[in-house]
């Protein structure tokens, strides 16, 4: 039960980081107490309330948090390689889950001869898109993101407030 309490407390604090306030009496999660309850109950809940879902969605739509909305780079994940999981892992040049991919050898997870890339916002027909090509359109105050010509990945947004 202590582990559950720690996990729910972490969920609660993470909820605050996602714009979720403490629940009021009008909020419901189907249990006696919800994760964003202002007090800890002996009946520990693992569920967020209807109010929490609305507040989190509002936060994402209004604040446009890039750390949540940006697609991760394929090389961001460190794990045991698994073919076909759409992640580029240690020892793989490309994710070899799709035999029909013209850029990637499905048997070896290596790029086919002459290919620079197999997927990514800056990959087109097995080649890196040219430097300056738009890979992610502007959102709000953030400018367009552009390919570098050296990678298949669209660079992370460089705008800072």
Swiss-Prot record:
Provide the disulphide bond pattern.
27-51, 29-34, 94-109, 96-104, 103-126, 117-123, 122-147, 135-154
Domain of life the protein comes from: Eukaryota
State any GO CC term: extracellular region
Q: Where is the Peptidase M12B domain?
A: 1-72
* All copies of domain Disintegrin, residue ranges: 89-161
Q: Keywords, A to Z? A: Cell adhesion impairing toxin, Disulfide bond, Hemostasis impairing toxin, Hydrolase, Metal-binding, Metalloprotease, Platelet aggregation inhibiting toxin, Protease, Secreted, Toxin, Zinc, Zymogen
A GO molecular function assigned to this protein is: metal ion binding
Q: Where is the active site?
A: 13
Which residues are listed for Zn(2+) binding in this entry?
12, 16, 22
The Gene Ontology biological process terms listed for this entry are: proteolysis
SUPFAM superfamilies assigned to the protein according to its UniProt record, in alphabetical order: Blood coagulation inhibitor (disintegrin) (SSF57552), Metalloproteases ('zincins'), catalytic domain (SSF55486)
* Localization per Swiss-Prot or TrEMBL: Secreted
Motif residue range(s): Cell attachment site: 139-141
The organs and tissues expressing this protein are described as: Expressed by the venom gland.
Whether Zinc counts among this entry's keywords is yes
Propeptide residue range(s): 73-88
Which EC class heads this enzyme's classification?
hydrolase
The EC number(s) given in the record are: 3.4.24.-
Function in brief: Disintegrin: inhibit platelet aggregation induced by ADP, thrombin, platelet-activating factor and collagen. Acts by inhibiting fibrinogen interaction with platelet receptors GPIIb/GPIIIa (ITGA2B/ITGB3).
PANTHER family the UniProt entry points to: ADAM A DISINTEGRIN AND METALLOPROTEASE DOMAIN, DISINTEGRIN AND METALLOPROTEINASE DOMAIN-CONTAINING PROTEIN 28
Q: Which family does it belong to?
A: Belongs to the venom metalloproteinase (M12B) family. P-II subfamily. P-IIa sub-subfamily.
Subunit structure of this entry? Answer: Monomer.
What name does UniProt use for this protein? Answer: Zinc metalloproteinase/disintegrin
